[in-house]
């Protein structure tokens, strides 16, 4: 394991690793313990009591955070005709079909999210092996395979984030930047936590949310006690 820098070590001293903090305290600490010289991302991590190996315990979806993520997402839309015009009018960064499939096959990835109309998925499927490992493959569960391209582009630009449980039963998702006001980070966290609760698989047994923490890009993890706030 790489040796932690002096700033990180000093920041970590501010955190009691045995304690689960009030959510407001936790967010305050995230800002205090940030050691990056840039506007670092604040991330929430949820350790869940699910078995991702079982299809009925997979968790995947997307949610629009009330205060956005602080990052401008570059959107590529695969669509034709009127739907292509709709995507352009909505502010998509790139709109096309076979031309962009060829570019991606040649190693072009100057985008963050792909939206595709259902009739284009046969073509998009040709680059599935390239997109899949990068988490870029459009999926109906995240609202990125749809004929409602205007809505999809608008939501992504407004701060929509995708979430997916990993092989270890964890979900990691950005909830903003350290430059955000604490209240806005708390609101985003609450929205994400509420979304995770509602996504609980019926087949999940025992304790569902085992651990919750927040951290900045180069800061220490801070445990959160979700019972310290009410999620509507």
Curated annotation (Swiss-Prot):
Molecular function terms, GO-annotated = rRNA binding; structural constituent of ribosome; tRNA binding
State if Iron is listed as a keyword: no
The question of whether RNA-binding is a record keyword is answered with yes
Signal sequence extent: none
> Listed GO cellular component terms?
large ribosomal subunit
Q: Name one Pfam family in it.
A: Ribosomal_L1
Any GO BP annotation: translation
**Cited InterPro entries:** Ribosom_uL1_bac-type, Ribosomal_uL1, Ribosomal_uL1-like, Ribosomal_uL1/biogenesis, Ribosomal_uL1_3-a/b-sand, Ribosomal_uL1_CS
List the keywords (alphabetical). Repressor, Ribonucleoprotein, Ribosomal protein, RNA-binding, rRNA-binding, Translation regulation, tRNA-binding
Quaternary structure (record)? Part of the 50S ribosomal subunit.
Q: Which family does it belong to?
A: Belongs to the universal ribosomal protein uL1 family.
What the protein does?
Answer: Binds directly to 23S rRNA. The L1 stalk is quite mobile in the ribosome, and is involved in E site tRNA release.
Name the chain's protein. Answer: Large ribosomal subunit protein uL1
Species annotation? Bacillus licheniformis (strain ATCC 14580 / DSM 13 / JCM 2505 / CCUG 7422 / NBRC 12200 / NCIMB 9375 / NCTC 10341 / NRRL NRS-1264 / Gibson 46)
Gene that encodes it: rplA
């Amino acid at each position: 394991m790489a040796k932690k820098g002096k700033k990180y070590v000093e920041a970590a001293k501010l955190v009691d690793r045995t304690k689960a903090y009030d959510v407001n305290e936790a967010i305050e600490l995230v800002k205090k313990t940030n050691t990056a010289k840039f506007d670092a991302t604040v991330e929430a991590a949820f350790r869940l009591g699910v078995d991702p190996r079982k299809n009925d315990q997979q968790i995947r979806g997307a949610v629009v955070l009330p205060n956005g993520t602080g990052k401008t997402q570059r959107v590529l839309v695969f669509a034709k005709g009127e739907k292509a015009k709709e995507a352009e009018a909505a502010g998509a960064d790139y709109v096309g079909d076979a031309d962009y499939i060829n570019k991606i096959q040649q190693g072009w990835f100057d985008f963050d999210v792909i939206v595709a109309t259902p009739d284009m998925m046969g073509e998009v499927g040709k680059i599935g092996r390239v997109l899949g490992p990068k988490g870029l493959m459009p999926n109906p569960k995240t609202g990125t395979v749809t004929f409602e391209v205007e809505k999809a582009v608008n939501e992504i630009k407004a701060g929509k984030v995708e979430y997916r449980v990993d092989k270890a039963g964890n979900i990691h998702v950005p909830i903003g930047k350290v430059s955000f006001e604490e209240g806005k980070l708390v609101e985003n966290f609450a929205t994400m936590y509420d979304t995770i609760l509602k996504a609980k698989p019926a087949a999940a047994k025992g304790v569902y949310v085992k651990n919750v923490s927040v951290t900045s890009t180069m800061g220490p993890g801070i445990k959160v006690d979700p019972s310290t706030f009410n999620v509507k």
